[in-house]
A protein has these predicted regions:
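Active-site metal-binding motif and surrounding structural segment of the metallo-beta-lactamase
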Residues: 80-85, 91-187, 333-350, 363-368
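Bacterial N-terminal signal peptides that target proteins for export
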Residues: 1-11
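Internal alpha/beta domain cores that form substrate/cofactor-binding pockets in large enzymes
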Residues: 340-410
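C-terminal motif of bacterial Sec signal peptides marking the signal peptidase cleavage site
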Residues: 18-21
Length: 462
């Protein structure tokens, strides 16, 4: 059952006071200092210059920002009319370490925010404030939490500061973003019960973080006028621009294995119903369990502007599809999406993701990897991407070119490393007014200045 929380109408002054008390930034030292915005672009490619601060977004353009925090995944979308959508809030608490697949000493050798105790959501907060100076919109109109993994919504432990608004949650990830900004709506895969495929607040290995997130959302729903909804597959009316001035559509493709069929708003449930779930240990789902792993429950969407299309699928993967065909959630989502211009790599480019079949159907001109450990993306996945899509351009927020953990992954070849178009920074896709073409920029991250390091394009939307 889908539920939408409704609110009584409050007097204007009361609403103003309520929101003011709900979106005050926590008292922390800014990570990104205010910088000059530069000249407004007129849509000409030549106005984006390497070595200068990224030009401000202009009305009619659509921006897709892959914000690098070294702690997970975060995408911020500015629609042509200034409507703002935040997808995830990269804030794991993984320490700098050299333990197998979580090794991150390579990428953090360049920049390690954890040395100063800086949380991912603090970096995101300051980044969003710069973007909001362009748009004049101080509201995050929509937040989508794609799924309940810490590198997407925010880890939690006893060392984190408690929110000044409620003692029921601590500040990191989406809970901190909720405290720092006025927010219109939060969409996720579990509201309001968070009980599929089992009780997510008491059984998974990250139950403490999930409970912290749920407490924050419930507080802001009850006290701050935030709406919370289950992400609904198949529809185009859940995430909508504030105006109808531009042809922008956000199609919700899938959530919890409920996948759009391509026919109207019709969907098909591909995962077992809750009553049919069989899992030995919810804290460690195995390939033989009749239970979907958290990654394949991700919220999946396609954002379209004119001829431009962007596919983002959280941590979609196809692990263990030989045991249960429905555990390949990636391919059916690709089939119903069809061809796109830009794709966020599924599951950071990890193993058992971005299959040749899915890549062939999506056929992106550009793939962006939001990476946060040394083995993102896997060398085999990079090679597969280019073998499947020889002319595709690849961009990676953190790209480790040195030796990778023995027995986990191989070092990226010099030839493949040279093919990566942009890396080690924020990746920004800027779509021109009308959606006919776009450019991709890599901007500085560690200094917070958003200085342009690389510009690719323009690419022509198909």
């Amino acid at each position: 059952m889908q539920r939408l929380v409704k609110y009584a109408v409050l007097p204007a002054m009361a609403v103003s006071m309520l929101l003011a008390s709900c979106s005050s930034e926590s008292k922390t030292t800014p990570v990104i200092k205010p910088q000059p915005e530069g000249n407004k672009p007129s849509g000409q490619v030549g106005e984006i210059k390497v070595g200068e601060v990224i030009p401000a977004w202009s009305k009619g353009e659509m921006d897709i920002h892959f914000i690098n925090t070294t702690t997970g995944e975060c995408v911020f979308v500015i629609m042509p009319d200034g409507t703002q959508l935040l997808i995830d809030a990269a804030s794991s608490l993984l320490k700098t370490n050299s333990y197998g697949s979580t090794t991150n000493t390579g990428i953090r050798g360049r920049w390690d925010p954890t040395l100063s105790g800086t949380r991912g959501s603090q970096i995101i907060t300051q980044y969003l404030k710069k973007c909001m100076a362009w748009t004049g919109n101080n509201t995050i109109d929509y937040i989508v939490n794609t799924h309940l993994h810490n590198d997407h919504f925010g880890d939690s432990n006893s060392s984190l500061p408690v929110s000044s608004k409620s003692s029921t949650y601590r500040l990191n990830g989406i809970p901190e973003i909720l405290d720092n900004f006025k927010v219109g709506a939060v969409l996720d895969r579990g509201w309001p019960d968070y009980d599929y495929p089992f009780d997510m607040q008491s059984l998974p290995s990250n139950k403490t973080a999930v409970k912290n997130y749920v407490n924050a959302v419930k507080y802001h729903v009850a006290n701050c006028g935030v709406k919370a909804e289950m992400f609904r597959a198949g529809v185009t009316d859940q995430i909508v621009p504030k105006t109808s001035d531009y042809k922008v559509t956000v199609r919700n493709i899938a959530v919890n294995g409920n996948i759009w069929t391509g026919n109207g708003t019709e969907t098909k449930m591909t995962f077992p119903e809750k009553k049919d779930i069989v899992v030995a240990n919810p804290a460690k789902i195995t390939g033989t369990d009749k239970c979907p792993a958290e990654n394949i429950c991700s919220c999946v969407m396609k954002i379209s502007y004119g001829n431009f299309d962007f596919f983002t699928g959280g941590d979609l993967q196809y692990n263990n599809r030989s045991n249960f065909s429905w555990k390949d959630a990636e391919l059916p989502c690709a089939k119903v999406s069809g061809r796109v211009e830009v794709m966020k790599a599924n599951h950071h480019g990890s193993e058992a993701t971005n299959s040749p079949e899915a890549l062939n159907i999506l056929s992106p001109q550009v793939i962006v990897v939001n990476s946060w450990v040394d083995v993102h993306p896997r060398t085999s996945i990079m090679s597969r991407m280019w073998k499947t899509l020889p002319t595709m351009d690849l961009f990676i927020t953190n790209f480790w070119r040195g030796e990778r953990p023995a027995g986990v992954d191989n070092k990226v070849s010099d030839a493949d490393a040279a093919r990566v178009k942009g890396y080690d920074g924020n990746i920004v896709v800027r779509v021109s007014e009308g959606g006919s073409q776009y450019r991709v920029m890599t901007t500085s991250d560690s200094d917070g200045k958003m200085t342009v390091k690389n510009v690719s394009g323009p690419y022509k939307s198909r």
